[in-house]
Amino acid sequence: MKLAILGAGCYRTHAASGITNFSRACEVAEMVGKPEIAMTHSTITMGAELKELAGVDEVVVADPVFDNQFTVIDDFAYEDVIEAHKEDPEKIMPQIREKVNEVAKELPKPPEGAIHFTHPEDLGFEITTDDREAVADADFIMTWFPKGDMQPGIIDKFIDDIKPGAIVTHACTIPTTKFYKIFEEKHGDLVTKPETLNVTSYHPGAVPEMKGQVYIAEGYASEEAINTLFELGQKARGNAYRLPAELLGPVCDMCSALTAITYAGILSYRDSVTQVLGAPAGFAQMMAKESLEQITALMEKVGIDKMEEHLDPGALLGTADSMNFGASADILPTVFEILEKRKK
């Protein structure tokens, strides 16, 4: 199998967050006995996993930065990073972040510059600056593109070089629905004829070097392609999840924090209403829908930054407390504390 990686990534944004580390990369490095994997990041980590753990025999990385300032920081011994991560990553991560931030001050941003700690060629990857060369005959095309409206222009340059039946994935910078739309608008028959192009995601849900997980979007690829990618993801990333394409953003992007709170609330509310009160599931669903729709409508009407002006958080303290039983009691006490702090 040939894997084409379009976009090598840059560590500066990972360092800037102040919370990331190399836990997954170190784990893989130890598993396969290749210390140089320990400080890989972004697509390079995922490429190394696919090569070493899933048996992908050819990996090509394309990025214009290879003709510019692709910078490898070699101040840190891989073995030292691995040992630190066995105990507490923060024993070494502050020094790494400090060095990255220092280098980033003088180095241009991608595609003119990028910060890495391992060169892809040292992992047995081929490199190129030509996306067309990379995707030629590739079975799996993993994109790692910038945000915004730049993706259609990038895709337009190589779309005619993708072989029929190939799997093309995106990560965190675009929804699957919009990613598919680009291919549909550029080359409709490519995604609608029998030998279809399989558009999906290989979304890590976090920085790849930190967590071993991947989220695969269903709806725009064949079942066979999804199964193939799911099996690769399980072997390479350790944990793989399939989900409808429209749920990928809510589950994987920054709004996942809200999704987690909302979903836990729905499930707890449902169990309290149906199991303790004995209400029909349809009634519980009707009430849940009313809650979600009206709070969403309020946010859209007045703006997320002005919601408290129109609904005092304290208004819920004297009503929701009557539902503080069953599964809801696992959540509501903490919620009440938050509402109390925010009430007018």
UniProtKB/Swiss-Prot annotation:
Transmembrane segments: none annotated. It is an enzyme of class 1 (oxidoreductase). Keywords: Methanogenesis, One-carbon metabolism, Oxidoreductase. NCBIfam families: hmd_TIGR. Signal peptide: none annotated. Its EC number is 1.12.98.2. SUPFAM superfamilies: 6-phosphogluconate dehydrogenase C-terminal domain-like, NAD(P)-binding Rossmann-fold domains. This is 5,10-methenyltetrahydromethanopterin hydrogenase. Catalyzes the reversible reduction of methenyl-H(4)MPT(+) to methylene-H(4)MPT. One of its GO terms (biological process) is one-carbon metabolic process. One of its GO terms (molecular function) is N5,N10-methenyltetrahydromethanopterin hydrogenase activity. Pathway: One-carbon metabolism; methanogenesis from CO(2); 5,10-methylene-5,6,7,8-tetrahydromethanopterin from 5,10-methenyl-5,6,7,8-tetrahydromethanopterin (hydrogen route): step 1/1. InterPro entries: 6-PGluconate_DH-like_C_sf, HMD, HMD_C, HMD_C_sf, HMD_N, METHMP_Hmd, NAD(P)-bd_dom_sf. It comes from the Archaea. Pfam families: HMD, HMD_N. It catalyses: 5,10-methenyl-5,6,7,8-tetrahydromethanopterin + H2 = 5,10-methylenetetrahydromethanopterin + H(+). Belongs to the HMD family. The lineage of its organism: Archaea, Methanobacteriati, Methanobacteriota, Methanomada group, Methanobacteria.
